[in-house]
């Protein structure tokens, strides 16, 4: 049997996790000479590369001096908490990557806590030590304190530390003596991380993720917990609800480099993919045909936020997307449920074209919307709503831990902003000329906070947050004060009319764009909504020469990303998402009907 090490790599967003995996693959000779290894091999999905975040976990294996190292890349964001937990179940140890300047961040804490609970032993890698002003030794102390506060065992606290720079491709015992390769880290992995325990007995495998191939259908991925599985073997699938189902394994694959390799049998400790099973979900156990003994299923974080999804019914529907009917959208949401553990979908009040979709946060849901948009779907999404719970007869809401790191001169602004949104400051630390402020804040208060924080700190703030717990309802929060500017009728927007209306507020459209009546085209300076006509062109007669009049000077439009739109809209507005554009609109397009319903 080959010597195996299963290792998960955990880190905060953008501390260089995916870069490190690239370098490990390079060291394991996964690329032939001259093969394109432009980096970020694992973040293969376009969205992941653009945002620089890992959303789905991946598996890769490398060979190092005769030992097979299975590397599992985990998402760092707590919005993808469902992913993190099940991935750590496959590992025997973890690498905790920390930025030598920023130190441990809320998300690091989130992933580390899960890893320590399962009992994994960490190797701490202090990365980016080539950055100016970094403080590797302090960061090491901070990590130790963090683990101590998370109730780590003595064995876990006796962790090895590796210093280095993944980007420049070196790792060493001491940051003052750089080497020119990352061998030190790989040797440490083989030395420190335990080999998987070999458990004899009837086979058990917990399904922790899914793969899909159009050729063989759904594929179950997991780690063999005990015993041996072989091709053509009869097995029982034990479902989460306790139902048992007899079936047969067609093929078994193990991860080899970037791809997969077909094998006859796998032993305990192997991570493998199993082809040919029909009905299974994540969290089911594949066990012995005669005496099934299921493993305990994975606990998954409950969703904390929900949104209303509806089909696109605006005047421009079907012009830009391929999939626009309710059947298309419904099938796509059902397909997403198979892979996306923390997601919930239910029809809205018996309607066939409206769904309530719940997830872990705005980021989690907006990644789903953005993915659908790129696949050619058109849909509309309502304002994100927090999921309340009734605990001991009291209305409770989700509270998050929020960390803001800003230059000192902006700290009072930040505290003011967060406390207005019912946040409570829990700690404040000064590090050099920057301040680290921690708050407990309702999830409702975080919606739309990021844009304001960045504006107020001139783009200098680093903001991170993660779900903490449910607490009693904190009271009303004042959201955006300004009203919307609404297009009066459908047509093309003209520079002439936009120019005349500039003093009324900021515009979200450029001259020449098509608009429809009821579309939100700008933000009004006052708190009431204003219906404006942007489709009016300049009347030219033979009295007026076209040249002598003054030119229209139009300020460029405010460009908003999908998340910003979702956080910006009010309760009576929707975001319309199509492959080519993101528009905001009123739910009731007709102005008179809208006035009437406001009176009621």
Where are these regions (language model features)?
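P-loop NTPase switch module centered on the Walker A-proximal segment
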Residues: 1-98, 102-104, 142, 210-213
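Residue-level signature of catalytic and energy-coupling elements of molecular machines
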Residues: 14, 20, 52, 73, ...
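Interdomain boundary/hinge elements
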Residues: 36-42, 150-162, 196-206, 242-255, ...
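Canonical P-loop GTPase G-domain recognition
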Residues: 121, 131-191
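Conserved nucleotide-binding/hydrolysis modules and their immediate coupling elements
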Residues: 204-307, 317-319, 482, 491-541, ...
């Amino acid at each position: 049997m080959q010597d195996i090490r299963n290792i998960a790599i955990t880190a905060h967003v953008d501390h260089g996790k995916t870069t490190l995996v690239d370098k490990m693959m390079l060291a394991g000779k996964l690329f032939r000479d001259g093969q394109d290894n432009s980096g970020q091999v694992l973040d293969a999905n376009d969205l992941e590369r653009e945002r620089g975040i890992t959303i789905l976990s991946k598996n890769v294996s490398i060979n190092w001096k005769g030992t097979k190292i299975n590397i599992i890349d985990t998402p760092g964001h707590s919005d993808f908490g469902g992913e993190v937990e099940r991935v750590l179940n496959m590992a025997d140890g973890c690498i905790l990557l920390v930025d030598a300047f920023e130190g441990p961040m809320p998300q690091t804490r989130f992933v580390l806590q899960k890893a320590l609970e399962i009992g994994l032993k960490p190797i701490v890698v202090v990365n980016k030590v080539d950055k100016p002003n970094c403080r590797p030794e302090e960061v090491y102390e901070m990590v130790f304190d963090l683990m101590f506060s998370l109730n780590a065992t003595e064995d876990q606290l006796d962790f090895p530390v590796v210093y280095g720079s993944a980007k420049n491709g070196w790792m060493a015992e001491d940051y003052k003596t750089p080497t020119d390769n990352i061998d030190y880290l790989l040797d440490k992995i083989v030395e420190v991380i335990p080999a998987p325990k070999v458990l004899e007995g009837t086979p058990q495998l917990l399904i922790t993720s899914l793969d899909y191939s159009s050729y063989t259908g759904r594929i179950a991925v997991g780690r063999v917990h005990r015993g041996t599985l072989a091709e053509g073997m009869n097995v029982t699938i034990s479902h989460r609800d306790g139902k048992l189902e007899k079936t047969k394994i067609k093929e078994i694959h193990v991860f080899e480099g970037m791809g997969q390799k077909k094998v006859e049998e796998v032993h305990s400790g192997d991570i493998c993919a199993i082809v040919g099973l029909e009905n299974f979900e994540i969290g089911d156990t594949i066990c012995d045909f005669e005496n099934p003994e299921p493993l305990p299923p994975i606990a998954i974080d409950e969703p904390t936020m929900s949104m209303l999804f509806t089909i696109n019914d605006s005047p421009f529907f079907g012009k830009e997307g391929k999939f626009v009917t309710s059947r298309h959208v419904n099938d796509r949401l059902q397909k997403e449920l198979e892979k996306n553990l923390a997601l919930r979908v239910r029809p809205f009040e018996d309607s066939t074209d409206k769904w309530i979709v719940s997830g872990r946060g705005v980021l989690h849901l907006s990644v789903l919307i953005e993915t659908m948009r790129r696949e050619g779907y058109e849909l509309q999404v309502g304002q994100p709503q927090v999921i309340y719970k009734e605990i001991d007869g009291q209305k409770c809401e989700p509270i998050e831990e929020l960390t803001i790191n800003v230059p000192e001169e902006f700290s009072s602004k930040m505290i003011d902003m967060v406390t207005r949104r019912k946040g409570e400051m829990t700690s404040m630390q000064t590090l050099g000329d920057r301040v680290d402020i921690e708050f407990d804040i309702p999830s409702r208060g975080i919606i739309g906070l990021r844009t304001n924080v960045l504006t107020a700190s001139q783009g200098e703030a680093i903001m991170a947050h993660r779900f903490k717990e449910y607490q009693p309802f904190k009271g009303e929060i004042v959201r955006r004060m300004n009203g919307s500017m609404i297009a009066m009728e459908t047509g093309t927007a003209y520079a002439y009319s936009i120019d005349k209306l500039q003093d009324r507020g900021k515009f979200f459209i450029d001259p020449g764009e098509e608009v429809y009546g009821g579309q939100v085209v700008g933000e009004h300076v006052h708190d009431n909504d204003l219906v404006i006509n942007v489709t009016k062109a300049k009347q030219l007669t033979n009295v007026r020469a076209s040249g002598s009049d003054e030119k229209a000077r139009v300020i460029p439009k405010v460009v908003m990303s999908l998340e910003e739109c979702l956080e910006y809209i009010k309760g009576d507005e929707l975001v319309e998402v199509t492959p080519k554009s993101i528009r905001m609109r009123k739910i009731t397009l007709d102005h008179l009907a809208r006035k009437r319903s406001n009176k009621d």
